[in-house]
Amino acid sequence: MAAKILALWLLLAGTVFPQGCCQHWSYGLSPGGKRDLDNFSDTLGNMVEEFPRVEAPCSVFGCAEESPFAKMYRVKGLLASVAERENGHRTFKK
C-alpha cells in the first residue's frame, strides 16, 4: 500500500513540476510577455509588403480617385486591429 501511495505522489509531482517551472516563448517575445518595440515597425512593414498590389485600383473597379482620408482611416483600422491582436483583445462587429 505504501509503495502505491509513493508511486502516486511521484507521478503527481512528475506531471505538475515540469509544467509549473517552464515558460513558452513565442517568436519576438521576451520573458514576461514583453515585446521588443524596436522591431514593431519592421513587423508592420512586412505586413504591408505582403498585401497584394494593384497598379491602378480605379482601372480595375472603374472608381474615382480615392480620398486620402479614406486611406488614413483604413490604416488606422489596420493598426488598431494589430494592436488589439497583440494585446489579446478581440472586437466583434454586429
Swiss-Prot record:
One of its GO terms (molecular function) is gonadotropin-releasing hormone receptor binding. PROSITE patterns: GNRH. It comes from the Eukaryota. Residues 1-22 form the signal peptide. Keywords: Amidation, Cleavage on pair of basic residues, Hormone, Pyrrolidone carboxylic acid, Secreted, Signal. It is found in: Secreted. Synthesized in preoptic neurons and is transported to the pituitary in the preoptic-hypophyseal axons. One of its GO terms (cellular component) is extracellular region. The modification Pyrrolidone carboxylic acid is found at Q23. The modification Glycine amide is found at G32. Stimulates the secretion of gonadotropins. May be responsible for the regulation of the hypothalamic-pituitary-gonadal axis. Belongs to the GnRH family. This is Progonadoliberin-1. It comes from Haplochromis burtoni.
